[in-house]
A protein has these predicted regions:
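ALDH superfamily catalytic-core signature
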Residues: 1-102
Length: 102
């Protein structure tokens, strides 16, 4: 997803979160990269972070759950390894899901 400087930040953030996290991130068209061009980067990252922080994570059978948990400890470990790898390569972790408390 590419977000240009004249984009509607709220619409772009809503779209990015929906595309990345909708259907528990298991869509064949789920996104994993958002390219923010120019000055839009900081407000977009903040808007996406706010939305992710407010996702309701819980069992899929609970009506208010928006995202289910990872299916196994093995899967969680793999995700943690991806986050650690990105951080080691210089990425800034904005929403850290390694130790989810909900």
């Amino acid at each position: 997803m590419v977000v240009l400087p004249d984009a509607d930040i709220d619409l772009a953030a809503d779209s990015a979160v929906s595309a990345a996290y909708g259907s528990a991130g298991e869509r064949c068209m789920a996104i994993s990269v958002v390219v923010a061009v120019g000055e839009v980067a900081e407000p977009l990252v903040n808007a996406i972070s706010d939305r992710i922080d407010n996702l309701k994570i819980g069992p899929g059978m609970q009506p208010d759950s928006e995202m289910g948990p990872l299916i196994s400890e093995e899967h969680r470990s793999r995700v943690v390894d991806y986050i650690n790898s990105g951080e080691a390569e210089g990425a800034t972790v904005v929403c850290d899901g390694r130790m989810h408390s909900r």
